[in-house]
Amino acid sequence: MSEIYRMRFTESDKEKKTKMWQVLVRHYLQQFVKKDFVVLDLGAGHCEFINDIICGKKYAVDVNPGVKDYAGAGVEALISESTEISVIPDNSIDLVFSSNFFEHLPDRETALKTLQEVRRILKFQGSIVLISPNIACVRWEFWNFFDHTLPFSHQGFCEALAVSGFEIKKVVPRFLPYTTKTRLPQSSRLLRFYLKFPLCWRLFGKQMLIVAEKR
């Protein structure tokens, strides 16, 4: 799959994505993270989120060893399956973040096992913040990417979280556009504008945002 990513994103694309992630973190996602939090980025990929978030301790978890090349200063990169992050103790993480990860899992059983593992490592009332394509919005476009295997709607994912021992705190069915290759937003300035006006989300959003808390 690493060859797919090399074909999909040029160096210019990666630079643009990094800048847009900086805006997304600083102008929206930071609100969920206190400065003393222990944060784990699940399926961290190029580490755009975890490198920029301000918190006390940072973990980047990915099955791809290449994650170590992208983890910035102060980020501990862990090579691990999402269903068994054995190096992380029980009840030790304040917040787990995951973006564009669950749709790559092979089946729903693996998704549920992953959520159970997330619950294990979270502190009591710790949170998971999830961004993922919403099949209710993106529909057939979901399959435009060869490595997408597991579609979820916001309703379906909330149900999976509930049965895994989480309480839903926030659901935005339409949050971000489906891909950075879409027409909007196409720059850091446009993204800042977009994040300030939820009406834009309803027009262009095809990815969901869900925040849930460990019960």
Task: Cite the ranges covered by each PLM segment.
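Conserved N-terminal segment of class I S-adenosyl-L-methionine
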Residues: 1-89, 95-99, 115
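Conserved acidic functional residues
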Residues: 90, 103, 145
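Short glycine-centered segments of the SAM/dcSAM-binding site in methyltransferase folds
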Residues: 38, 126-127
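Active-site micro-motifs of SAM-dependent methyltransferase domains
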Residues: 84, 103, 137
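S-adenosyl-L-methionine-dependent methyltransferase catalytic module, highlighting the catalytic core
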Residues: 15, 97, 106-121, 127-215
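Short acidic capping loops at alpha-helix termini that bridge into adjacent secondary structure
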Residues: 91-92, 125
